[in-house]
């Protein structure tokens, strides 16, 4: 069935925009415009629900975009601007970063962003129990872990002795988009059935017309939020 669906792109549609004209969503300004602007909350919710289904106790119902600036407490502090910062209906904080090139310090950078978002929640007089889970998501356009095939890596605070999570408040996700693209070309993943794969494949779809048309088939047949995202993407 998947091969038949995948082959359906050959039929085409006269009005379909060529992938050559589509903006690269792995460029931060385009990514933020689609996933991080007011009015597109439902698009980010769909993406996060697909990605974090094993991390959250229940699906995200609503979220609010937060100020992406990590404000300096002291003049000498580093000024940082996040790609996307949001607060979920449960209070969980989420940061999503898109990275085109390997700067060789992604883990430390992600932990720094996590720490700033986590500590910023606590104001004077507030108990530590008021701190909410904080998740950082790094979408990488390069291979970071060549030693294994999996394109999605999740880091947590781990109790080595008891072999269980020490705290669920910290969670760092690494997604290697180039690995996923190779798996799609090898027909190892199925965007018709896997929501997470579907949304991730949207990011590099500008360079592959077959993939773009496959995603549009899926959007038109079974995913109205993806269809909204693709319509907005085509108008960029």
Question: What label would you give each PLM region?
Answer:
Residues 1-236:
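Elongated, amphipathic alpha-helical interaction scaffolds
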